């Protein structure tokens, strides 16, 4: 009888507990990623980001040689100090979440409107947008919105994925890129292990 009474009491407490106290994982995940993107927008140095891709890499990015289909990739080069400094900042930002996440850097390509490049991806190699092996790709409307307006945009186009895009500013206040704070509902730790 005591057990039945105790069980009934517990069930009543669960039934009347406010629903807002324990948000759904996707709601919690979205909020944490929005916070990371907000902080990252202030912490990532746009002046340093603009130095990452070297002039040589920019020169060869759109060159096509029928004798060398990997010309652009073979000549991709970065400024080590700028790259490592920014990558460490992005990695630290990803540790602000209570779940596995990544913070990636995307930069528009000067002289090629509508094109964007993932300059740095992080340890889990998660991105809702990046196509493996591509040096650059067409800019998505959500990315254009961030680069044009400076507003953060949350994207959940792929099932189970959440990305929050936020602007990266240089010292003049210009938007020079964007970060993608990203995670997914079910993470497979071995998915990207080659």
Predicted regions and their residues:
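Short amphipathic alpha-helical segments
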Residues: 79-91
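A short beta-strand signature within small-molecule sensing/ligand-binding domains used
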Residues: 159-167
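Extracytoplasmic/periplasmic sensor domains and loops in membrane signaling proteins
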Residues: 87, 119-158
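Bacterial N-terminal signal peptides
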Residues: 5-14
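Helix-start (N-cap) segments at beta->loop->alpha junctions
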Residues: 181-194
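Short hydrophobic/glycine-rich mini-motifs in sensory/regulatory modules
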Residues: 170-179
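Juxtamembrane extracytoplasmic/periplasmic/luminal helical "stalk" adjacent to the first N-terminal
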Residues: 17-70
């Amino acid at each position: 009888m005591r057990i039945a009474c105790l069980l009934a009491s517990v069930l009543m407490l669960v039934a009347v507990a406010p629903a807002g106290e324990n948000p759904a994982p996707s709601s919690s995940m979205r909020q944490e990623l929005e916070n990371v993107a907000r902080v990252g927008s202030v912490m990532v140095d746009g002046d340093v980001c603009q130095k990452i891709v070297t002039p040589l890499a920019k020169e060869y990015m759109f060159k096509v040689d029928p004798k060398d289909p990997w010309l652009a990739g073979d000549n991709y080069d970065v400024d080590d100090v700028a790259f490592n400094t920014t990558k460490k900042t992005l990695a630290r930002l990803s540790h602000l979440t209570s779940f596995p996440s990544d913070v990636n850097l995307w930069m528009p390509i000067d002289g090629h409107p509508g094109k964007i490049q993932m300059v740095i991806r992080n340890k889990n190699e998660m991105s809702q947008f990046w196509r493996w092996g591509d040096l650059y790709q067409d800019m998505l409307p959500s990315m254009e919105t961030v680069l044009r307006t400076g507003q953060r945009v949350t994207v959940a186009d792929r099932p189970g994925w959440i990305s929050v895009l936020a602007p990266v500013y240089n010292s003049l206040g210009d938007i020079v890129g964007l970060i993608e704070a990203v995670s997914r509902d079910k993470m497979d730790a071995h998915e990207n292990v080659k």
